[in-house]
Amino acid sequence: MSELQISRRKLLKASAAGAVAASTVSAPSLLMAKEAKAAQDTSKIRDFDMIKAFYANYPKKLAAVRAKLGRPLTLTEKLLFVHLYHPESLTEFKRGQDYIELRPDRAGTHDIGGPMAILQFLTSGKERIALPAALVADHLVTAQTGVRKDLQIADRDNVETYSFLRDVSRRYGFDFWPAGTGICHQVFLENYDFPGAMMLVTDSHTPTAGGMGMLAIGVGGADLVDALMGMEWELKMPKIIGVKLTGKLSGWVSAKDVILKLSGILSTKGGTNSIIEFFGDGCQQLSCTGKGTICNMGAEVGATTSVFPFDDSMVRYLNATGRAAVADMAKAVAADLRADKEVMADPA
């Protein structure tokens, strides 16, 4: 009993000393601790250094674009022009006629679109890929019975392909996502997509990332190889189709109904050689994943890609997926991740 009392007295004394020490901690020390915690939180964010550099350079690049063109810009123009491979080439490109050369921030592929492109990359003699890229094994999984049985069949039937993709990923620097980890577009949205960036993936529904305010374009294997090697990626300067969303969804209406309605207006070819840029107060009524659904299906009207302006829904999604630091950086340049006010006031 006495031993317990002594221990308790020592504990109380130590606690009091600790309280005094805590009360004398300076504000800078608390700030340093907070910053250290924030730094620790970023350790799980993929390619964080690249993202940090992107947002540090974005305002300067955009300022140079504004100085050269001297006019209000659409969001599409902002994202294209800050990604010019040769910034000095900037001019008033003719939409639908001139070609521009771009430098994407990241790339991706899957187990069907990837193998031939990677084999071509291997002939280049490059030691590593030139930009962050992910490889997702999802297309060779056939949904028939259930996850366990279907994955067993996929692993058995595609063992050589999966082994090859895993090995080259380790050797050349791809992030490899094995079968069963998800559909590539969702994997990208949850782990890689961030507002303002540009991404190339060998899949027609890559524009899903437009729901995150990203310029994401589906490409062929040869285009992917150009990006992996750090070469210029050429694109015909797209036309821009502005779609103003007003009001809010009601009743049984979902985000998918928005793109279905738009598809009926544009037809299956109406978006060819064009980027669909959404704007208006109605955008804020849609979730980030709802926006992603709309952009995903923009491929059905032939659009090069689709994109939404940065808003709070993207902040919430980034926060929910452990990327609050990315959300904070995007918020710092929020006005430049949307079309200029003059454009929204007079889109024509």
Show where each model-derived region lies.
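N-terminal secretory signal peptides
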Residues: M1-K10
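N-terminal export signals
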Residues: K10-L31
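Short, well-ordered alpha-helical packing segments
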Residues: L12-A19, R166, G196, S263, ...
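C-terminal segment of N-terminal export signals and the immediately downstream linker at the start
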Residues: A27-A63
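Conserved short loop/turn motifs at secondary-structure junctions
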Residues: F48-I51, L69, D150-D155, F279-Q285, ...
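Long, structured ligand/cofactor-binding scaffold of large enzymes
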Residues: Y58, A63, A67-K236
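Accessory "access/gating" subregions that flank catalytic or transport cores
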Residues: R156, R166, P178, I183-A197, ...
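Mobile "lid/hinge" segments at catalytic clefts and subdomain interfaces of large enzymes
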Residues: T202-V326
